């Protein structure tokens, strides 16, 4: 094997080595960072924006519930035309006899006010249930934001990983192509056999296949990145794990997750809503007290030119005695639903616990894999250098060299994959703990506050326009 072949091959192999460190290298001035990509997703992702709209819609249930405290005012107006013909049954010559007719236009208007004074605390409990629903929807929004940010971090690291692997695979094609050319030259001078050439040709075909597969994988990762982040990836800066948000041990992670995860809080609010619904249904069995007032003005009611003004105030007490059993059935149903919500809350706690333990295990495994892959690269490089030197003096075959190169390639791919897995696992752990939010990550965004919209609508009596929540 001549010196020219050795130098060119070493240059190609060294170029492949630089791809290994693409996940940990320095970022260019114009490169997109992981934090800036997540900021894009936070502001533009349709899943997050849809959930924000859902929270705003849930806010409106509070003023709806409060309407039970407020009066119901209705205005009425009517107008008609009447024709009356009266035959007295006596001759027209007799006083008051004959037939008389009357044409009137009766009309009038009025206002009625109904005010509930006591409804078995149903309105009070409806307001409390609506407020709990609002709090639950906010926690669901937090869960959605966390999921999108995790998806964004995963998509970002997948593009970095697949770009680096594609670079390795393309470089591997160049290395093997150069080796095939040199093997053919050696075959022409009788240094190797036709078998050596065939082995190099087969390995080149396999390398091209792997490069094509790596390119397809990268395209898929780019598509996912576009879906989550909202733009196509350009130059991406290296991603780094969230070590500053990672606790020292799994027990600390579990303590945080079980106390803070928004999915658990959302289920707890759902339990509150279900328990209040039981009280709402039971309230239908309580006496109902209300007062009604009305004012009416009538014209031409009995004869042309007459008018009448009337006003009334009526207090009404209704005591339910038996309503067919519907309220009792609805109350039992609400109790069963409350039990279901408690079980669902327990299930979510178990899911959070399992997610934390699983994410912690993946993070520990990724750290170990990085160390193992680095050691594997060192050993594979040493082995390749030795095999190449032995091949110079005829003690190794072309296949031995190809195998050693493949081992080194595999080690580099393993390191890239492990680097990606460590970053994603750290984000997964923080997500499982319930702390993967825009503020904890320090994203440079306008942080969305659902309380602003809530304060704008919670006490509105009238109005059709929708506040923007800003």
Predicted regions and their residues:
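Acidic, low-complexity, intrinsically disordered peripheral segments
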Residues: 2-8, 83, 417-470
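Periplasmic alpha-helical coiled-coil/stalk elements that build and connect Gram-negative outer-membrane
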Residues: 2-11, 147-258, 362, 366, ...
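Bacterial Sec-pathway N-terminal export signals of envelope proteins
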Residues: 29-78, 84, 116, 233-272, ...
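Small/polar (Gly/Ser/Thr/Ala-rich) solvent-exposed segments
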Residues: 49, 72-92, 99-104, 114-143, ...
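Gram-negative bacterial Sec-dependent N-terminal signal peptides
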Residues: 1-30
């Amino acid at each position: 094997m001549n010196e020219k072949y050795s130098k060119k091959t070493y240059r190609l192999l060294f170029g492949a080595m630089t791809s290994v460190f693409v996940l940990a290298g320095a970022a260019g001035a114009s490169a997109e960072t992981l934090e800036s990509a997540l900021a894009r997703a936070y502001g533009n992702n349709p899943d997050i924006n849809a959930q924000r709209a859902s929270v705003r819609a849930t806010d409106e249930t509070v003023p709806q519930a409060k309407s039970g405290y407020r009066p119901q005012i209705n205005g009425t107006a009517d107008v008609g035309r009447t024709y009356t013909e009266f035959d007295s049954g006596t001759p027209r010559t007799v006083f008051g006899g004959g037939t008389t007719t009357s044409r009137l236009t009766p009309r009038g208007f009025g206002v009625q006010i109904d005010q509930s004074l006591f409804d078995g605390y149903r309105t009070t409990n409806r307001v409390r249930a609506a407020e709990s629903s609002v709090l639950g929807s906010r926690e669901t929004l937090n869960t959605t934001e966390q999921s999108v940010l995790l998806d964004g971090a995963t998509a970002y690291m997948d593009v970095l990983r697949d770009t680096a692997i594609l670079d390795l695979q393309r470089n591997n094609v160049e290395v093997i192509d150069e080796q095939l050319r040199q093997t053919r030259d050696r075959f022409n001078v009788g240094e190797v056999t036709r078998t050596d050439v065939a082995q190099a040709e087969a390995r080149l075909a396999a390398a091209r296949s792997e490069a094509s597969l790596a390119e397809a994988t990268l395209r898929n990762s780019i598509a996912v990145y576009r879906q989550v982040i909202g733009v196509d990836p350009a130059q991406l800066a290296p991603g780094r794990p969230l070590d500053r948000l990672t606790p020292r041990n799994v027990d600390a992670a579990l303590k945080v997750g079980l106390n803070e995860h928004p999915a658990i809080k959302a289920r707890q609010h759902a339990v509150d809503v279900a328990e209040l619904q039981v009280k709402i249904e039971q309230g239908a069995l309580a006496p109902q007290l209300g007062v009604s007032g009305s004012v009416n003005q009538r014209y031409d009611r009995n004869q042309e030119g007459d008018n009448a003004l009337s006003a009334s105030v009526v207090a009404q007490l209704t005591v339910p005695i038996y309503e067919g059993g519907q309220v009792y059935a609805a109350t039992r149903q609400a109790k069963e639903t409350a039990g279901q919500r408690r079980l669902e809350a327990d299930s979510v706690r178990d899911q959070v616990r399992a997610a934390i333990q699983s994410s912690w295990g993946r993070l520990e495994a990724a750290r170990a894999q990085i160390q193992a892959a680095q050691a594997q690269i060192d050993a594979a490089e040493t082995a390749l250098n030795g095999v190449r030197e032995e091949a110079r003096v005829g003690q190794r075959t072309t296949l031995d060299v190809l195998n050693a190169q493949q081992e080194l390639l595999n080690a580099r791919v393993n390191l890239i994959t492990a680097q990606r897995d460590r970053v994603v696992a750290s984000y997964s752990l923080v997500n499982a703990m319930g702390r993967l939010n825009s503020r904890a990550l320090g994203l440079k965004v306008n942080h969305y506050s659902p309380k602003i919209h809530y304060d704008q609508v919670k006490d509105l009596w009238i109005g059709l326009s929708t506040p923007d929540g800003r």
